[in-house]
């Protein structure tokens, strides 16, 4: 299966100096092949305007980016129960809306650890689709972010289109989930579940930001 995103695509959305790549020796020896390609060749966005905030520990010292921390180093590691086997070795990528973003090195699956809930939720099938989602959100930013555009004619349409494109690339994050703007489900109801991470991002797009 062909990759969804490459370095040229990411550089068309983010400044090249804001795309972090890792030396191979700083990555685990046993790392899913597609994830390794993303981390060594494509890069992760390190941009304050991005919905993804990379783990700050990656940039301590002069030889950054550093090796990734693992979930075993989380402050509240002992509070997590009934987690997938081997999760303690997952790499900590960063955060989105206070949810910790992690990478299962064996399968290449991206998980989030929802803030305060001490569980794992599958965020993307692969690091490739995760990074592709960050690309889509950034390339469409002029159509929903008033800090880069004076006029935003249809942020709602942009959000709807983005969600459809994301589903085509990786349906996993959206399975059984109504969008934030759905009239069929009330996300603000007292008994409503927590809105999944990518739908929170798309809710921001829908409402426009800046």
Give the residues covered by each predicted segment.
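A surface-exposed partner-binding patch
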Residues: 1-101, 168-210
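Compact, glycine/acidic-enriched structural inserts
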Residues: 111-150
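An amphipathic alpha-helical core segment
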Residues: 135-179
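A ubiquitous, low-specificity "background" feature that marks scattered single residues
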Residues: 110, 130-132, 156, 181, ...
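A contiguous binding-surface segment within folded domains or other stable secondary-structure elements
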Residues: 86-118, 122
